[in-house]
Regions:
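Bacterial N-terminal signal peptides
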Residues: 21-31
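Acidic, low-complexity, intrinsically disordered peripheral segments
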Residues: 2-6, 34-50, 152, 156-168, ...
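Periplasmic alpha-helical coiled-coil/stalk elements that build and connect Gram-negative outer-membrane
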Residues: 73-194, 198, 231, 277
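N-terminal secretory signal peptides that target proteins for export/translocation
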Residues: 1-15
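Sec/SRP-type N-terminal targeting helices
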Residues: 62-75, 96, 121-123, 127, ...
Length: 309
């Protein structure tokens, strides 16, 4: 009887230890998952401004070496890589959408061609396949360029960027540039002489009214700023035009895809709509990138003039 009791106690003891061990394993796994989730979540919160601050902090530690760069130059480079990644991520999403349309069109065209009951020719099928191949090639190039952009950006902040989700990229948005003229920009940046001479009543003496002392602007610097300003305004005009063209080609693409799905469309017209939308939308995104980078370059030049003075 005693042996039976002891064996029962032993079994209960073993079961208790097993349950405790299992509980500890589950607790450990949960803790690890929470830590990984927290790390991943924190990685997605790095905004453009935070990237700039991190890069400036890391750059300041290199003052004693030849790797140090002026702060305005670092800020410009960070913005350039950030805008590049932001643009190419959107272009990649668009390319994947076009890839799906091409794949679906190729499969349907092959069925029609093999059945011999439709108007799809060998040439039509070849064009769709070439369009698909070209889109797949674009996807490879964009994924490569995004990887390079992450490496370059990570080098500036001295931190590895593992994935695009580590930085807070959004849909590319044209930067707000409210200045209506170059003189308006110079006044806003206090780069225009504001001192005026007012002649006295007798015309012999003159009084000088001084406003806030403006930053000196040489003719050479004025020319550099004006060229950069023109780059911003021309890019802004292209963004406006590209936005209109994108809406037109998007509507055309939706119409051609729907027609082809219902069996009333033409493979040649679908091919042209896919190619046209790819070109127009990609060009529109490039125009946003060029505008944002041009504005960043103008800011860099302006800040460098402040620094020299």
């Amino acid at each position: 009887m005693r042996n039976i009791f002891l064996r029962g106690v032993s079994v209960v003891s073993k079961d208790s230890r097993l349950m405790i061990a299992v509980a500890l394993v589950v607790l450990l796994q949960t803790s690890v998952c929470l830590l990984l989730a927290a790390e991943t979540k924190s990685g997605t919160t790095i905004s453009l401004q935070e990237l700039i601050e991190l890069s400036l902090d890391y750059n300041s530690k290199n003052k004693a070496s030849n790797r140090y760069l002026p702060p305005e130059h670092i800020t410009f480079i960070v913005k350039k890589y950030f805008y590049q990644i932001e643009t190419q991520v959107e272009q990649l999403d668009m390319a994947k959408e076009i890839r799906d349309h091409f794949q679906k069109a190729v499969e349907k065209s092959e069925e029609i061609f093999e059945s011999g009951e439709g108007d799809v020719s060998q040439a039509d099928l070849a064009k769709l396949k070439l369009g698909l191949s070209n889109t797949l090639n674009n996807i490879i190039d964009l994924e490569h360029d995004i990887q390079i952009g992450k490496l370059n950006l990570g080098k500036l902040i001295n931190k590895k960027i593992r994935d695009v989700s580590d930085i807070a990229v959004t849909d590319p948005i044209p930067i707000d540039f409210p200045h209506t003229s170059f003189d308006d920009y110079l006044i806003a940046k206090n780069l225009t002489p504001l001192a005026k001479k007012v002649a006295g009543k007798v015309g012999i003496f003159s009084n000088e009214i001084h406003a806030e002392q403006p930053t000196k602007l040489t003719e050479e610097n004025r020319l550099l700023l004006y060229k950069a300003y023109l780059g911003v305004t021309s890019s802004k005009d292209k963004v406006i035009l590209g936005k209109k063209n994108r809406k037109i080609t998007r509507a055309l693409l939706v119409s051609e895809v729907a027609n082809y799905d219902f069996g009333i469309g033409d493979s040649q017209e679908l091919f042209e709509a896919l190619v046209m939308y790819t070109r127009v939308f990609s060009s529109y995104l490039d125009s946003i990138y060029n505008l944002n980078v041009s504005a960043a370059e103008l800011t860099k030049l302006t800040d460098s003039i402040y620094t020299r003075n």
